[in-house]
């Protein structure tokens, strides 16, 4: 344990109250023990997140959405909660009778697989005889990825040579998502931690200190995951793969940033104080306010997501807020305790030596180091500098106008090769592309025929059917003459399945269910059915996509202004000013616009992405504004502290010089952790990774280094208007 605290030297840095030796030993030991216990209990939950998470898009829609209401009735109409897997078999030549017989036998064998809960439909040949399709009912509560993998393996051995097999449909795409998210608790975490470790080793040129900082981030994540898992298990929160990935990255990045701030203060105090305890207390005093202000601002911004109609967004708010809270807590309790226990050895081989003279030396450091030179350069001609910087950033914003954020097809959500995507393409070549994912209309029984007529007249509908337990396939065809019978002439027509006076009419889409054409068809159907005066609800895969995208667009329009107002109010309280917060928020928004503009150009011309989810700009905004304002908070709280003693100009120059290194390191760490999201082959996460990583670097090296300091220097003491600091002449 470190040496006892000697009598504090009365210097400009202030006295540290004398603390009994027993407390100096007991408090750090207790803190370390508590965090070790939390990490020990929470660590195993990394492997159990799948138990309480779901990637079902319907589950995240509001209960008022039509697609949600239709999904809630699906089990009642079908008699099971099966998720359809669509087997598509193609051939370059016409499929022979022998091959068709072999496929029939293969389909019958599939019923014995675990997770297949009903009879597999017989093979249905395409008109050109170059493909067949079979419907396999998969238990929605089973591990869909495993079931689909077993289907592919079984078919690979049973299907005759020369035939190509794909498993697509809702089950196939669900399996793709499950496989893509499988690397979240392994690959993503490993890449993020490795990136942070490399950066910390470069920053500190030490072996032990980076491990201490990294352990702080990991312990914070373990504790946060422990709490979140139990909240999700109790149904308080809904977790998805993307929420889990963002949580991991956010906690590691934020905890490391806060740790960097504390370590910088602590190392400085060790040079001025002989006692490690006095240095710890003094470092905490200087770190608590900016960390709490920064973390509190991020939490407030994230909690604005609670206003979202989508549960995927409203859940991310509290999940991420819990993560940030534990990141702050770990950086302000576990890290100081661990560093105090390790003493100056933690910085080996560059241990900070106690230098009594340094405590009495003048406080101006602007003449030393890279950031001292940067601060002086900015102070020479601030007005031309901030004008030029603002113009360049504004030009970058223009690209945001070309961002296509109206949603992407389900088949493009996964970036890697996909059997489900290939199967969907093959399906569209030989069958109506919407087979297996029809539009579903729940309507009063007496309106069945009229509803079927509206669907049949729609240009994008290939055929119409009604759910019927009496029909072998479960859906009986409906034409202008009514429900069609199966069997010899004169056979009676089957009765539709009626649930609470309602029937389910299905329309097979002519286009792929995740295509813009299919979405347009469903929107037109909703309008046409409403005009007929039916009391109907329209659901299905396409309707789910429409309702999700519409809710996302609504959230974007509502939440972004609320986040701005909340952060602005927090900054006004923190800086006791009106003008400074307005300028800080404006510069951060400008930075976000530039990041979004550059991202739009990169996505379209470099990566050739098909578009973006409507939630991408919202997530990018919340993370960049909430996290980007962090660095301005770190900078301006120090500037205000210095301005109280030296005036605004000298305070700005000194504040930039003193905080430049640590804030830059924090920005690089946060950018690296968010960039790690790109290792998960999900389009949404890859786009968020680029926008946030690029935006954070832009904020770190341009906005916080050039734009904000130059603006502050040009405006002068008026930046603090209408606070007492402004009335006192800036000092």
Task: Give the ranges of each region predicted by the language model.
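Membrane-embedded transmembrane helical bundles of large multi-pass transporters/channels
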Residues: 1-50, 116, 139-405, 533, ...
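N-terminal extramembrane/targeting module of integral membrane proteins
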Residues: 37, 57-61, 67, 91-94, ...
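Structured non-transmembrane domains adjacent to transmembrane bundles in polytopic membrane proteins
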Residues: 54, 63-85, 92-174, 402-611, ...
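Short, charged low-complexity linear motifs
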Residues: 55-57, 184
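Charged, low-complexity surface segments at secondary-structure and domain boundaries
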Residues: 58, 358-361, 410-412
